């Protein structure tokens, strides 16, 4: 009797142990991410050929205590390696596990490699060569809690690589995951008609057809780990292959189950057909190109098992929520008598189905933890509807009614105002209703939703549910394409993590504001390149700039500088610490046809630059951050703590008769007026002049001050 370990993703252990028992294994013991078992050689081969759930099969040679590098070396050295593989074969070592003296897996692998090479040499054999990528013979070592297990990778390449897949789609589903879905859903036991309306490259349907036809999952594989194992019994292995071929031939003739697969992407459907043909089951599966929301129900009852798109796969969160909401409608309307099983990593998407799960299971898709939910749609609760009547957006009659009504009201009022004002970007909603704690900004025909951090006492599930309601109801409330909704999360940043890139892709637009043009980037950063609440402040800067020298400190993307230049400034100096924002400011100037030597752009720490510059200005706009601890700054900056010292430095740059417009976004900011007046400044609050109509609901969004020479 030989000892083996069947490795598998976490969560597969119980189902795998049942599969091993059914195949005839003994002494079965579940472990973390796998199952130990015993079997004679012939059964070890059979399990390698027939296991649908295992990732790999390891033939265990040694298992024992390991508390030091010396013990690890001795354990590996004690194995009679020349009886396992030839020194003419290349080998590699896969080492798993950390802890104790094992600080990294490379160290463990190197120790075992040294022991193997030394053992060959000490037995008067020339040493075999190491080949990391494509070795003939792979050794597997697993270290856990002071114990080392050393074995031979009996199965070779990962067992989910069945050999029938040609190429993959954007988000391929591993074959053993598909098999686990079929087992855990109950389909494998019932073996009824099966539909996958998001079939992609066909993995779920192909695995199901192979199960139904008694086709061994390893029958199409060309390589196994035991190919270069010296005790390999080729005769026994060939007999098992012959048996598997015979069973497959009989199984295909007896299979009466119907399989249906569709996908909206014709390229994926073509790929699924090629994969099914490679697997020998193409004639059993009815593939078609179609939208899951409009397909006809192919049979009266059966199983629908699918892996629809989710956040990590192929989609925008808003359009995905719309999709799941519509899917729920489709299932309830037309799939009476069906069992439905859905794999997804986002419980909010699953909740958008509005179906009660009979069972919820955890199942990993690679490193991604997913929920695998099972539903039963009862026939008496369904109705047949025309596909054209499936809702395109969420029905605001039963979700987020107060939010939807408020958005509609705001939109009706602000859209007319914006056109009259000469702007096409504005704030549509700003946490008007406390339970819907988001800001909604409209940029042309796009919407950016910023989710504020909820108070700690509100459960995360509640905030997610409310955000889902917002995303589902917004498209119909204002008539916007769900794909034009962008979601961002704004929260208190910690450490050095302040304004960082969010995603690699860009979505750039050009917006117009009182005749000025600005570039927006809606996706790449938390902020879009234009602070909408400062719209009137920028306009004021432009109105005060004619015939004056202007300086814009903490300039961000230079939008106030553009207004100054368009307003007739004799010179404009734009200063910011970020190269990215300085370059962005230059782009904004170019957009407005502003190309002149009188426009200067300075990349510098503004606080330091103010101290060393010899330039003087007639108008200075300064809009510092509330707080900053950027790596480029020697010390942190806090606007309330440091504004007196900062404004003292700014005041020194001001020409007689000049003006400073100082603004910041710190709520409950307290201006040290007496300390500033003592330095000869005249201070006037101008909040009422700089708060746009779309921010009247949030009067504390910023505070603005006009500073001049006293007297």
Curated annotation (Swiss-Prot):
EC number: 2.1.1.173, 2.1.1.264
Annotated protein name in UniProt: Ribosomal RNA large subunit methyltransferase K/L
Chain's gene name: rlmL
Annotated function: Specifically methylates the guanine in position 2445 (m2G2445) and the guanine in position 2069 (m7G2069) of 23S rRNA.
Top EC category: transferase
InterPro entries to which the protein is assigned, alphabetical: 23SrRNA_methyltr_KL (IPR017244), DNA_methylase_N6_adenine_CS (IPR002052), RlmKL-like_Mtase (IPR000241), RlmKL-like_Mtase_CS (IPR053943), RlmL_1st (IPR054170), SAM-dep_methyl-trfase (IPR019614), SAM-dependent_MTases_sf (IPR029063), THUMP_dom (IPR004114)
Family: Belongs to the methyltransferase superfamily. RlmKL family.
Recorded catalytic activity of this chain's protein: guanosine(2445) in 23S rRNA + S-adenosyl-L-methionine = N(2)-methylguanosine(2445) in 23S rRNA + S-adenosyl-L-homocysteine + H(+); guanosine(2069) in 23S rRNA + S-adenosyl-L-methionine = N(2)-methylguanosine(2069) in 23S rRNA + S-adenosyl-L-homocysteine + H(+)
GO cellular component, one term: cytoplasm
Record localization: Cytoplasm
Domain of life: Bacteria
Keyword Transferase: yes
Keywords from the named record: Cytoplasm, Methyltransferase, RNA-binding, rRNA processing, S-adenosyl-L-methionine, Transferase
Alphabetical list of HAMAP family matching this protein: 23SrRNA_methyltr_KL (MF_01858)
A GO term, aspect molecular function: 23S rRNA (guanine(2445)-N(2))-methyltransferase activity
Every THUMP domain range: 43-154
Keyword Transmembrane: no
